[in-house]
Each structure stands twice: as C-alpha cells, then as structure tokens.
Amino acid sequence: MGRGRVEMKRIENKINRQVTFSKRRAGLLKKAHEISILCDAEVSLIVFSHKGKLFEYSSESCMEKVLERYERYSYAEKQLKAPDSHVNAQTNWSMEYSRLKAKIELLERNQRHYLGEDLESISIKELQNLEQQLDTSLKHIRSRKNQLMHESLNHLQRKEKEILEENSMLTKQIKERESILRTHQNQSEQQNRSHHVAPQPQPQLNPYMISHQASPFLNMGGMYQGEDPTAVRRNRLDLTLEPIYNCNLGYFAA
C-alpha cells in the first residue's frame, strides 16, 4: 500500500510540526549531499527553523566562498538589468546590507560550531574541516603559551641572577666594614695599653727591721698580749737593774 499524499499546509500541532521539520530537513540535507557527489555540483543549502535556528550544508569547505560567489553573480546580473543610477545605488546598498548580514550570521554560526554547539546539521566533511581548524588553533595557542612561559622563565632567571649579584656585593661590603671595625678596635686597644701606667715595685724590707718590728713592745704598766708572764717579769727586772748599772758605771768613771 503506497503512502498517501500529504496536504500542503501548515501543521498546527507543534510537536508534529517539529518532528516533520526534523525529518524533512535531514532528507533535504541528504539530497543536497547526494547531488553534489553524483553530479559534481557546487551545492549550498541554508535553512532557518521557525525559532530562527540555522541549518546549512555546503559542498565546499567554507560557506563564505559560495556566498561571495553568489553575491558577485547577483550583483553583475542586476547591474545589467538596472540602467537607472538611482536604482543601482539603492540596489548596491541593499546588496551590501544583505552581504554584511549574511556574513555576521555566518560568523555567529562558526562561533557556535567552535564552541561545540549546533553540530547536528554538519556533515562529516564539515566536521573534519572544523576539527582540523580547531587542531590548528590549538597548536597556535600552545605555541604562544610556551613562548610566554619561556619568556617568563628567562625573566625570572635574570632577576635571580641580579639578586644573587646584589647579595654577593652586600656580603662583601659587610665583610669590609667588619674588617675596618676590627682594625680600629685593635688600634684603640693598643693605644690604651701604651697610655696605661705600670705599677711601681714594692720596697724591699731589711730582715733586721722586720725582726725588730716583729719583737714585742715593752709596756710599763701592763702585760703584752700573747707573752709569757715569766718573760714579762724578766723584762721588768731588766728595766729595774739597768738604771742601777748605769749609775754605778758613772760612779766608777768619776
């Protein structure tokens, strides 16, 4: 039993409309891909959903080339058909506006693709081209990152060398100042030693004087501490006899 004919009118049910759009879009992209391969034709397909979502297909590696070719062809054809200059100016502005708008939309679409979004409508060939572009971009990013890291490392090494040299110079200056300080200190000590007066020698005592000073003193009225009482009585006797002896000698001398 064959498939019935579908009535060409807007589908009111949103779910059915979305399902039909997805199926027909996939079939349309498949047909565009088949005709580009079978007939060696340059095919480009642009589809916007009712929500404004873009779906496209291009047999070339880049959609921009196809759009630029289309614009040049359309512009040349319109120039031949429109003799009035005023009309040509308006047409040029309209074409420029359309071209810039299409370019902006294309850039936005490419940006979404680079972010990994809206990849459902892209063919295998376009995915391969996108992957190659991303790999090339990653190589450039890694190369730039390595260059910056290398420059930063060299800068840190130069700074480290400068700090080490400055530290060495400061250490040398400290040692020189310490040496000068020690020299001044030694000179001051030598000057203090030279100005210091040497102690005078103690006088030598006569042994006879030491013996005489060490002898006990006579005490007429008492007893010398530490002496024997017998010795005290003998001293008193000597003192008593000495005047008598002196008197007798004087008498005989007369």
Curated annotation (Swiss-Prot):
Q: Where in the cell is it found?
A: Nucleus
Q: Where is the K-box domain?
A: 90-180
Stretches of Polar residues bias are at 182-191
Per UniProt, what is one GO molecular function of this protein? RNA polymerase II transcription regulatory region sequence-specific DNA binding
Disulfide connectivity for this sequence is none
Q: What is its main location?
A: nucleus
Q: Which residues form a coiled coil?
A: none
Q: Which InterPro entries match?
A: MADS-box/MEF2_TF (IPR050142), MEF2-like_N (IPR033896), TF_Kbox (IPR002487), TF_MADSbox (IPR002100), TF_MADSbox_sf (IPR036879)
Domain MADS-box, by residue range, is 1-61
Q: Name one GO biological process term.
A: flower development
Q: Where is this region: Disordered?
A: 182-205
Q: Which GO terms describe its cellular component?
A: nucleus
The signal peptide here is none
Keyword annotations for this protein, in alphabetical order, are: Activator, Coiled coil, Developmental protein, Differentiation, DNA-binding, Flowering, Nucleus, Transcription, Transcription regulation
- Self-association state and partner proteins as the record states: Homodimer capable of binding to CArG-box sequences.
> Miscellaneous notes for this chain?
CAULIFLOWER may contribute to the shape of the floral meristem. This trait has likely been selected by early farmers during the domestication of modified inflorescence structures.
User: What is known about what this protein does?
Assistant: Probable transcription factor that promotes early floral meristem identity in synergy with APETALA1, FRUITFULL and LEAFY. Is required subsequently for the transition of an inflorescence meristem into a floral meristem. Seems to be partially redundant to the function of APETALA1.
Protein name listed in UniProt: Transcription factor CAULIFLOWER
